[in-house]
Amino acid sequence: MPPKKSSARSKQQQPPKQPPKQPPNIDPGSSFTPESFEKELKNLAARAKDETWARWLLEQGSVYLRSSLLLGLVAVYANVSELTLSPVYGSIPVSIWHDRLVMAACFVGWACNLHLGRVLPVRMAYLLPLIALYIPVAQFYLFGLSGTLTAYHGPLITEALTLAPLIVLSVACTATYLDGADLSALPGFMRDASPGIASYFYYRLVEKLSAGLLARYVGSAIFQTRVVMEAVLGASYALVAPSRLLAFTLPALLHTAFLNTHVMTPMATRSLNSTLQANDWLLHDRKESLTGYISVADNLKTGYRVMRCDHSLLGGEWIRYKGARVAEPIYGVFTMLEGVRLVEVAEPVPDSEARALVIGLGIGTTPAALVAHGVDTTVVEIDPVVHEFASKYFQLPSNHTPVIADAVTYTADLVNTTTDQFDYIVHDVFTGGAEPIALFTLEFLQNLEALLKPDGVIAINYAGDFTLPPPKIIVHTIKQVFPSCRIFRENQRDEDVIEKEKRDFTNMVIFCVKTERPVTFRRATAADLLQSRTREHFLVPKHEVSDKDFMALEEPSVLRNNDTAALAKWHEKSALGHWEVMRTVLPDVIWEQW
């Protein structure tokens, strides 16, 4: 066992004791106090927290702003695309596939956003301005194939090659942006589905609102015309997603500015006229308006003038054969409507004391004749451009009362606010391949009945296919309001055409009175004919229609405001048949070069 060290030696080896340390003497007013450090740390923490919230708000705001901009732009573009196709195919054929194509493109874009992001050589957003600005170019050349593509497949193929790629990439970009949305505040079962659901309803909202605004303001300025709106939307995409690829849009911009004859500029109109004149046509004027693309053109070879609305004709008159008092119409049905004056009544009214209400103007054939007879005539027309062109380019006299308004609203107001009644009512509103449903409902016809004098006469023009239910439904509804009617076709029934083409498309005029007495016509006098050769042949109706001429087997229903499905479901077939008829009236190139 080792020896113990002495305690004395241990004491000698211990270091001397140091006096206790005193805290530093810090001035209480200095910034280096513990309290100041603690305060500074708290300030830094608060600032970091504020910066985190600001960054979060900025990031989330960017996500939703970019998403809403892209969805809003493509929703508006979809509506403009429909408008752009309607002069070539008509609004109803364009609508057949439009919604289904849009929904399919939205689904593909949303489901394949990650795959598209991987396979495309550049960012998806950079391609959007290129597609948007090249759409007018593609449409311009695809319209030239409309005769081959037909009204059923043409709109589908055209929008599949133009609008669909834009929707796919716009929705794919939106889905990618919304992946960065912070949805932690939502319940777990809603986080995955809410971006898609919210995007769908937002798209539909913008689509609906923009459709209403476009219908109201289209054509009111150059920047509110179809092709220019497409160019403006393309430029908006360029602002949302700028890149060096924008240099490749220059050819598209140059084509739209200098070669696209669908642009409503004087230079484009002159270029269009050079094409039309090579086909023996001359364009006088054109405008875009709330009912469609309106134009006035002459057939130089045959010598007549027509007014066009989208893919339909509102009427026409001969310019080679001038009438002495009124124009000579190219369609006999408009002179048949003047036969409303020939219906025998108990107490005939002199023309100088008679009043007439005309619903739908067209080129003004019937109103002009009524005015020529001295009848006080009021014309209700919804489209101001139609009235402008009828007054400027056709022989519509100025001494009539024009009402630029919706006929449904106008007649309802007239019934509710005045006791005015008319001796004659002429109802002529067909256009675009289908009837405006609201103007053939029981409620609208009841308003017309209230506006007709007890001994008055109404003439209703309807164009349709007698092999389909709509004509039967319309006539059945009319007879619920007017107890005595007779119906006449414009042309005689052609059994060979019916057998070959399986359709019987024609104009018919329904003459009705408010009493039970039979509808009969007095003999036309020389004064009734207005020195017109056309009226000699067509003023007095000839080809009467019987119940057996309506070939649809279905029992007709009454068309009401809240129950129009029975008629609406046949619009597509009627419009497609009307498109084919119009392509036999004018050549393809005239419809395509609008």
Positions of PLM-derived features:
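Membrane-anchoring hydrophobic segments
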Residues: 2-168
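Soluble small-group transferase modules, centered on the S-adenosyl donor enzyme superfamily
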Residues: 32-100, 183-193, 207-318, 323-332, ...
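Intracellular juxtamembrane helix-capping segments at the cytosolic ends
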Residues: 170-177
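Residues at alpha-helix termini
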Residues: 153, 181, 216-220, 373, ...
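A positional/structural detector of protein chain ends, strongest at the extreme C-terminus
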Residues: 1-5, 591-594
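Structural signal for the C-terminal ends of transmembrane alpha-helices
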Residues: 111-121, 177-182, 238-243
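Soluble catalytic regions of membrane-associated enzymes that act on cell-envelope
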Residues: 280-479, 483, 491-498
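Transmembrane alpha-helical segments of multi-pass membrane proteins
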Residues: 124-138, 159-166, 186-205, 249-257
